[in-house]
């Protein structure tokens, strides 16, 4: 018996909904083969009307995820582009689309995706991890795609872009765009961008950059900027007591101002709440940073045991089911600083059987930390292996070449690396920041072989000449950034 047309439609929708739920159940059971067997025929059907519902859009997302993990990245990207055009597409699908483009070196497509997200999908754009955005911008810079980079930076410096990982606009993008606008002969536009800088490290970077320094007349002193930021963050803490973000960033500013005990007190004011999964709306993304800032504050006071404990707690928060990559490296670096290189190497063994890979930058930090530990122990053969890796991947973190040479007491290599960075317009500011003078820390750090080599290298005539040619260093009335 044939059903009347009026009944066929609801029945078909009911059957489709049941199929979508089967796809969802298969994904929850980690059965991607079943997800693809059930979902691909629907997703690849010419008639996309079945995908218009929330369940349909969810099915597309799950198919894309399974295509990606199964290695069918080309098809995953095609389906992600189609799926993100659906009214009910999720922010997660937009993120996967961008990630596929990033990993596939599809730079123009990635910029197009950023553009589309900026036109009505602001929450998706804000949820893109800053490290992904940074990787895209580095790819564009390294491939000399300045027009595409400028397009991306214009979006990333708009008032509508407020990345979830930062409190307020991200100054690094303003700096990069100001450099491009200056190079393009638009100093007034660059000056306007620089006038909006609020973070002390960004202001310091602009002052050290010969291209931007003439445009920084009248900019606030870095310490004044830090005090202004602290006021802003304290206001945000008061207005948004259910958020960790402003509290963490206020603590970082207090530490920059040489007030680490105040930073600790502020962080500890919510210590009895951070284990409550409902206490803070941004707990999932910010708890790791809360522990990181607590560790850095204890480190500023030379309280090794408390700093190490905080780093371990931060690492345990996890990252894709594993110990947090950066927190474990930070812990190893702390152990090296306080004369515990054997413990540092033991800490780093967690990466020996990684079922995941770090970012290119993260891997450089891993090899640098391991190399410095070997140097402290006098294990020159093992150090040489780490040096070889770092030199072979120099473009991923040029400063790591300098750092491992300083750890190893190699004056010639350290000087050569510094001179090379100072001559490179894209590396110059980072080198000058590292070489500049800062306010004295509240507690003197323990002496290290790294520090001894550094003092010798910066007194060399060739290094002094390179510093002068790069525009010179400054003294800043705050503590060293990210110390």
How would you name each of these model-derived features?
Residues 2-152, 161-172, 176-193:
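N-terminus-biased targeting/localization segments
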Residues 2-10, 162, 166-167, 176-290, ...:
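Long, contiguous interaction/recruitment modules in multidomain scaffold/adaptor proteins
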Residues 8-11, 42-51, 81-89, 115-124, ...:
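Solenoid-like repeat scaffolds
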Residues 12-21, 51-61, 86-95, 122-136, ...:
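Generic helix N-cap/helix-start motif at coil->alpha-helix transitions
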Residues 325-326, 330-339, 349-389:
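Alpha-helical adaptor scaffolds
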Residues 398-483:
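Long, ordered, amphipathic alpha-helical scaffolds
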């Amino acid at each position: 018996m044939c059903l009347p047309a009026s009944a066929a439609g609801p029945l078909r929708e009911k059957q489709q909904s049941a199929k979508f739920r089967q796809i969802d159940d298969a994904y929850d059971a980690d059965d991607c083969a079943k997800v693809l067997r059930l979902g691909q025929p629907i997703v690849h059907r010419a008639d996309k009307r079945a995908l218009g519902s929330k369940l349909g859009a969810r099915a597309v997302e799950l198919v894309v995820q399974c295509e990606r993990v199964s290695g069918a990245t080309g098809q995953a990207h095609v389906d992600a582009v189609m799926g993100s055009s659906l009214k009910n597409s999720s922010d997660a699908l937009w993120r996967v689309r961008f990630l596929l483009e990033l990993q596939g070196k599809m730079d123009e497509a990635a910029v197009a995706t950023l553009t589309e997200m900026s036109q009505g999908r602001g929450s998706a754009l804000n949820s893109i991890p800053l490290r992904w955005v940074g990787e895209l911008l580095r790819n564009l810079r390294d491939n000399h795609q300045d027009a595409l980079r400028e397009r991306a930076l214009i979006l990333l410096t708009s008032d509508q872009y407020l990345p979830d990982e930062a409190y307020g606009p991200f100054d690094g993008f303003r700096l990069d765009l100001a450099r491009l606008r200056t190079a393009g002969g638009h100093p007034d536009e660059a000056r306007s961008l620089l006038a909006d800088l609020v973070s002390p490290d960004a202001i310091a970077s602009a002052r050290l950059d010969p291209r931007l320094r003439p445009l920084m007349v009248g900019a606030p002193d870095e310490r004044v900027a830090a005090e202004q930021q602290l006021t802003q963050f304290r206001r945000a803490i008061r207005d948004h007591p259910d958020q960790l973000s402003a509290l963490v960033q206020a603590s970082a500013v207090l530490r920059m101002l040489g007030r680490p005990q105040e930073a600790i007190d502020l962080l500890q004011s919510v210590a009895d709440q951070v284990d409550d999964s409902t206490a803070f709306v941004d707990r999932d993304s910010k708890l790791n940073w809360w522990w990181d800032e607590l560790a850095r504050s204890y480190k500023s006071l030379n309280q090794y045991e408390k700093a190490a404990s905080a780093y371990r707690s931060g690492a345990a928060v996890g990252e894709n089911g594993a110990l947090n990559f950066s927190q474990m490296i930070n812990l190893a670096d702390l152990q090296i600083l306080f004369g515990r290189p054997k413990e540092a190497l033991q800490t780093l063994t967690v990466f020996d059987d990684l079922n995941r890979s770090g970012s290119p930058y993260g891997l450089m930090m891993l090899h640098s930390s391991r190399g410095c530990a070997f140097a402290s122990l006098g294990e020159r053969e093992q150090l040489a292996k780490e040096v070889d890796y770092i030199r072979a991947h120099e473009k991923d973190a040029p400063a790591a070449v300098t750092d491992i040479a300083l750890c190893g007491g190699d004056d010639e290599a350290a000087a050569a690396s510094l001179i090379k960075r100072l001559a490179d317009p894209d590396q110059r500011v980072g080198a000058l920041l590292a070489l500049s003078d800062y306010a004295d820390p509240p507690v003197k750090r323990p002496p290290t072989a790294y520090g001894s080599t550094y003092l010798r290298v910066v007194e060399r005539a060739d290094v002094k000449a390179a510093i002068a040619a790069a525009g010179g260093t400054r003294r800043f009335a705050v503590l060293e950034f990210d110390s």
